[in-house]
Amino acid sequence: MSKVEAAVAWARRGYRVFPCHADEPGREGNARRAKKPMWEGWTEWASSDEATIRSWWGSQEFNIGVLTTDLVVVDIDMKHDRDGMASWFALYGGFDTLTVRSPSGGLHLYYTGANVALNQGTLGAGLDIRSHHGYVLAVSVR
């Protein structure tokens, strides 16, 4: 599935998306750059309109940012000696929501509801929250 089709699939599920820089393996600073939105103001410009999304992506393979305003996304990391999965299961015991593998190999748990403050690690080792005025990188969905 192309990135534009994946972005449209997220929009059809009701999520607002926007393009982030594409991966360019071998380019200095790629890991940081590929997670950045293509432009400032992405919180206002994010859209679920298919025509808008198609015009943004065209034939480009931009990464897909999903706006997390009106969502709470738990980011479970499994790298750099952080076992977010163990932390999550110790706290909550399982998954009860849309769960997708993140681009880095962890998991994103999508919850609708009130916005919460962004944080890193306060829920437990390897657990981060993305919410109001935040975003996560998405993967292809069907």
Language-model features, listed with the residues they occupy:
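Conserved phosphate/metal-binding and DNA-contacting active-site motifs used
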Residues: M1-R142
